[in-house]
């Protein structure tokens, strides 16, 4: 489809902010507060194209997937092409929303991509040994407590994490 060959309707919607329920006093992007906005974008004047501007560092993987699925469902149902545009940031869950497009556009300075998961901990093993503290952890299964700051970390543990 050549989008410049005839008069067509194009709707634009912006998805900005952290993805997920942020609590009582802050609004994040959730399926509940995005659904009607997206439905209107895909139905008002029967657009051939919906442009979705995204500016999000990500957030909830569940909400990211629900919003992604809603965009794809509406695009297929209404036979509408989707162009996603990364503004400043489309990272993590924002990147997932970005991938809902048939065409993806990003500025060369936009931060785009799956930034992954970070897990940090401290190691206190030598300290508790020096203090004579005995620690007991009960788990079922192999290495369930591998992030315990009072245990040594093995290469196997690190590989399991990443």
Name these PLM-found stretches:
Residues 1-80, 89-162:
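Small-residue-centered hinge/linker elements
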């Amino acid at each position: 489809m050549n989008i410049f060959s005839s008069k067509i309707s194009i709707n634009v919607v912006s998805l900005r902010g952290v993805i997920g329920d942020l609590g009582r006093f802050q609004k994040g992007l959730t399926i509940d507060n995005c659904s009607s906005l997206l439905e209107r974008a895909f139905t008002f004047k029967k657009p051939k194209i919906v442009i979705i501007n995204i500016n999000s560092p990500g957030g909830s993987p569940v909400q990211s997937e629900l919003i992604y699925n809603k965009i794809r469902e509406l695009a297929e149902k209404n036979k509408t092409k989707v162009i996603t545009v990364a503004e400043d940031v489309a990272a993590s869950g924002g990147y997932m929303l970005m991938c809902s497009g048939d065409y993806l556009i990003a500025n060369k300075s936009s931060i785009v991509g799956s930034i992954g998961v970070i897990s940090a901990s401290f190691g206190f093993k030598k300290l508790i040994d020096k203090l004579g503290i005995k620690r007991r952890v009960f788990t079922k299964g192999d290495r369930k407590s591998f992030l315990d700051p009072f245990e040594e970390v093995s290469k196997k543990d690190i590989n399991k994490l990443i």
